[in-house]
Amino acid sequence: MTPADLAELLRGTAAKVLDERGLDVSVLPETLTVERPRNPEHGDYATNVAMQVAKKVGTNPRELAGWLAEALTAAEGIDSADIAGPGFLNIRLAADAQGAIVAKILDEGAAFGSGHTLDGKRINLEFVSANPTGPIHLGGTRWAAVGDALGRILSTQGAAVTREYYFNDHGAQIDRFSRSLIAAAKGEPAPEDGYAGAYIADIAAQVQSQRPDVLELPAGEQQEVFRAIGVDLMFAHIKRTLHEFGVDFDVYFHENSLFESGAVEKAVETLKDSGNLFQEDGAWWLKSTDFGDDKDRVVIKSDGNAAYIAGDIAYFQDKRSRGFDLCIYMLGADHHGYIGRLKAAAAAFGDDPDTVEVLIGQMVNLVRDGVAVKMSKRAGTVITLDDLVEAIGVDASRYAMIRSSVDSSIDIDLELWTSTGNENPVYYVQYAHARLSAIARNAADLGIAVADPDFSLLVSEQEGDLIRTLGEYPRVVTSAANLREPHRIARYLEELAGAYHRFYGACRILPQGDEEVGPLHIARLALCDASRQVLSNGLALLGVSAPEQM
């Protein structure tokens, strides 16, 4: 019996108890929750439903808890239900009901943890979207890992997710990039507002290799060649780096296409016609304060050129025209102002602002021997995704980026993430999976088949703790999807690995010496198989490997 199964049983029991006493059943919450008590001696699960409902039906919480306890104790799969404090209920499952979680995991396999909370929802998930003017830095690396994991998690709940990269190939930064390439090709210092680093010289050399005559062209043509070829080369590098990091996109959307197709102009005219743009000092402004933004935003500047938000507005319209119900934007720490303006733009078009979600990620720092690492060998001024992977590997890089809430800044300690001890979170989790895989191999070598396990034999404290932890997995995945918080999966996996390691230390799994294989061995092997499955499922959601050996 999973926590969700127990919550469903609890609600049905509560409804019956209230109905039998002529009390109002409608006061019950649509969904009840059960929690694992901090002290396992208090039971397997606890609920405060009696305290939530008692006053609404005119009774005492402890009295209502007593009625519920009596009814629950008679239910199949419940060993006991005891009243605590002012009206809490502590519930203990029967051993076979608790073990049914293991059977469910083994039956569902890789699908265990999937749900239906987002069935039918079409979600556009835009992340990374780094400018094609340099390698991906640590902030973009964080979004690559978190965004990819979030896409996987949302998909498990039934959503149709499109991963999208917004290719910023329109604007002044591309001009600065091309001028930097020209300077490098000529052996001159980078422009004051340009880009530096060995990668600039590399790309400039590749442009010259493709167009040996480029420096002989007129200045305007010269810049256009460096711009076109240089951007293509840089973006190819970005795509390749992301692919090697385990991140691929369904759509690469070019910002420039919005201007070339007239989509920006059309969006602006639509807003003018709706009365949501006004003219002042020669510029056109979006009445974004009418829709909750902290100030009105310039859409068309007084010189007639489009402001950056004009492209954002047209881009949102394009996404909605493709049928997405929800557009999630994952942006850096310096983009807080985008939340209000994007929601205001949606509202100005008559859309529900809640069709826009903006997730803001905080800074990432790299630390070695307690000192921040600030310089990249290739990029010159910033640490890149390539630098991080070279230092600690793909798995550790992804896990380190995902395991903390995006609301918090993180320091990645190179020594910690390359260590092979329990203090390294990804090693701790992966080692649990490898140890479980070794047990499965050893069992196979001994000719032991896991058939018809008797889960009622799994009665030790460590077995119960491991089973209850396994049962939490679907709820954790659902929560991670609904809250857009992939770090919940990582933290859960660490908890599960801990529960498994404690079980491994306390319970002998395989027969030793001449000992015959008994029902308890079979039950424990089944528990091990279920644990390995859930660890594998969770690591897959994070895009981290589940090694068979370490």
From Swiss-Prot:
A motif ('HIGH' region) lies at residues 130-140. It comes from the Bacteria. InterPro entries: aa-tRNA-synth_I_CS, Arg-tRNA-ligase, Arg-tRNA-synth_N, Arg-tRNA-synth_N_sf, ArgRS_core, DALR_anticod-bd, Rossmann-like_a/b/a_fold, tRNAsynth_Ia_anticodon-bd. GO terms for biological process: arginyl-tRNA aminoacylation. It catalyses: tRNA(Arg) + L-arginine + ATP = L-arginyl-tRNA(Arg) + AMP + diphosphate. NCBIfam families: argS (TIGR00456). This is Arginine--tRNA ligase. It comes from Rhodococcus jostii (strain RHA1).
